[in-house]
């Protein structure tokens, strides 16, 4: 920066670290845990096992995204969690059915219908109202 100034420094920095330079698939292949490692994680018992409340506001979430999000939480190796979902459009029958089936299959999944979409902050607060955890995590419905 001393030799080129802030503008040239920024240009050189951004040219050097482009998102295209990061091959996520390659990185994931090199860092993906083995089945044995995942089982070891599941079998690990901690002295303190806090309940993690994961808050997710949903509103007309595409079916595949919603299913993948729920499945990704269910596959966590740490089992002391609850998924608190605030459904801001209960009239969407597809979303409502996915949530009903998921919460029936796994009691850690709690669904609260929000009568009217009040935006992400208020919908998240609706999910928070059903949370019982020691810690809170936030997750987007399409993650």
Regions picked out by a protein language model, each given a short descriptive name:
Residues 67-71, 96, 125, 133:
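Short alpha-helix within the catalytic core of nucleotide-sugar-dependent glycosyltransferases
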Residues 4-74:
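N-proximal low-complexity "stem/linker" segments adjacent to membrane-targeting elements
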Residues 70-116:
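Acidic donor-binding segment of Leloir-type glycosyltransferases
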Residues 136:
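Short aromatic/hydrophobic "clamp" motif used to bind/position activated sugar donors
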Residues 140-143:
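The conserved acidic donor/metal-binding loop of glycosyltransferases
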Residues 114-131:
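Glycine-rich, basic loop-to-helix element that forms the pyrophosphate-binding segment
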